Amino acid sequence: MKQTLWPLTRLTSLVLTAVFVSTLSAQPRVIETATHRFVEAQAGVWLGTGSGSVYTMSNVMVLVGKNDTLVVDSHVTPTAARALLDALPALTDKPIRYLVNSHYHFDHAHGNQAFPAGIEIIGHEYTRQKLNGEAGDVLEENTFRSFSDPVALTVANLERLAAAETNIDRRSRLQERLKVQREYLAAIAEVQPTPPNI
């Protein structure tokens, strides 16, 4: 029996080693910028998340084609969208031709206005109607207000916490969060909903 198990154990060990080695080589490419972390899901298909230095709120997808680039969603504010645009050269030198709005909510489409003139913004007809005001003012809807209205209180709370904190490291982290939230509060005022154009 021992002689039968030994080859089986060796075979199992070899298979597990091969699987382990193949997973090491299959690790996705990751590119980090000052504002974003991009993970390549497939060749030319990137998932982008904010690094925390700018309030982005939502993820983005970037598809790099043969001649140009398509971006899915534009983040929560023009400031966050500009940070994304500044980060994209780390992925590609191909121009952005398309921006796709997955839907009209503020955290996916309120960065549209920061994208270069001439790009095609693609979205559902309802997204266009919501962002151009035909179907109500998105800046007055509960979806937007429930997230944007409390930001001033968040800033005040962080100011109070940072001022009272005696631990230097914790105070530094609070001050960084405060900086990001202050910038987000200022960026909210800049939002001008910009609808899809195709």
Residue map of PLM features:
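Blade/loop signatures of beta-propeller domains
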Residues: 29-39
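Short, well-ordered coil/turn elements that cap or connect secondary structure elements
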Residues: 33, 42, 115-116
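Conserved beta-strand hairpin/beta-sheet module of binuclear metal-dependent hydrolase folds
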Residues: 37-90
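N-terminal secretory signal peptides that target proteins for export/translocation
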Residues: 1-8
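Active-site HxH/HxHxD metal-binding segment of metal-dependent hydrolases
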Residues: 80-82, 86-197
